[in-house]
């Protein structure tokens, strides 16, 4: 009998809180979903300058579109790689871990990259390296061009 009374008291308490608006601020929290606002960035890919992998002479263009989940990058370079070389694009966690994520090789001067990314905002730069064809070394060579991503990119 006491259990039924406790149940009724709790039910009445919840009902009165809801009717007075006491739980209205709590209810949306449990149903809230995180939706990132789509972010589009475009600009010039430039040669290194002043110790940065960007800021010098224009070498191409980049367009970045991210909604915090799917990230699309299209980069075009005006230059051609040297004989036996290929350009490779990277997202770089500059100022943090320094980790470089390879986005793949440019083909005919263009890099197209699309991926569902968990934390794209950890990356601060897009950088380009010139690598040997069929390079077996997974590490990035020195950057020959770059673009600083707007912060907070991908959030």
Question: What does each model-found stretch correspond to?
Answer:
Residues 2-12, 19-155:
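N-terminal targeting/export leaders
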């Amino acid at each position: 009998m006491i259990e039924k009374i406790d149940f009724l008291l709790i039910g009445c308490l919840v009902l009165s809180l809801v009717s007075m608006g006491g739980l209205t601020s709590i209810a949306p929290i449990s149903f809230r979903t995180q939706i990132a606002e789509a972010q589009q960035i475009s600009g010039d890919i430039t040669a290194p300058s002043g110790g940065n992998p960007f800021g010098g002479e224009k070498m191409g263009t980049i367009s970045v579109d991210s909604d915090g989940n799917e990230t699309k990058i299209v980069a075009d370079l005006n230059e051609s790689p040297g004989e036996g070389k290929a350009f490779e694009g990277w997202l770089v966690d500059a100022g943090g871990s320094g980790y470089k994520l390879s986005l793949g090789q440019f083909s005919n001067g263009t890099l197209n990259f699309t991926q569902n990314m968990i934390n794209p905002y950890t990356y601060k730069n897009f950088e380009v390296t010139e690598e040997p064809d069929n390079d077996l070394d997974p590490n990035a060579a020195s950057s020959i061009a770059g673009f600083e991503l707007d912060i907070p990119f991908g959030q």
